[in-house]
Amino acid sequence: MKVVSSIGSLKNRSKDCQVVKRRGRLYVICKSDPRLKVRQGGAKMKRK
């Protein structure tokens, strides 16, 4: 899975790709070609 800063152009790579929001992160998942998986949103800094 790749981590990218913008998934705007990556959501149209295949007709089976779909955008899903889980736990505050955006994912592009593709059932037909799992190599196309990407995630947007990184780790948040925790307060001590």
Curated annotation (Swiss-Prot):
Organism: Rhodomonas salina (Cryptomonas salina)
GO CC entries: chloroplast; ribonucleoprotein complex; ribosome
Gene label: rpl36
Protein name as annotated: Large ribosomal subunit protein bL36c
Main localization of the protein described in the UniProt heading: plastid
Protein origin, superkingdom: Eukaryota
Pfam short name (any one): Ribosomal_L36
Disulfide bonds: none
GO biological process: translation
Compartment(s): Plastid, Chloroplast
Family statement drawn from the similarity comment of this UniProt entry: Belongs to the bacterial ribosomal protein bL36 family.
Database matches in InterPro entries: Ribosomal_bL36 (IPR000473), Ribosomal_bL36_sp (IPR035977), Ribosomal_L36_bact (IPR047621)
MF (Gene Ontology): structural constituent of ribosome
Alphabetized UniProt keyword annotations: Chloroplast, Plastid, Ribonucleoprotein, Ribosomal protein
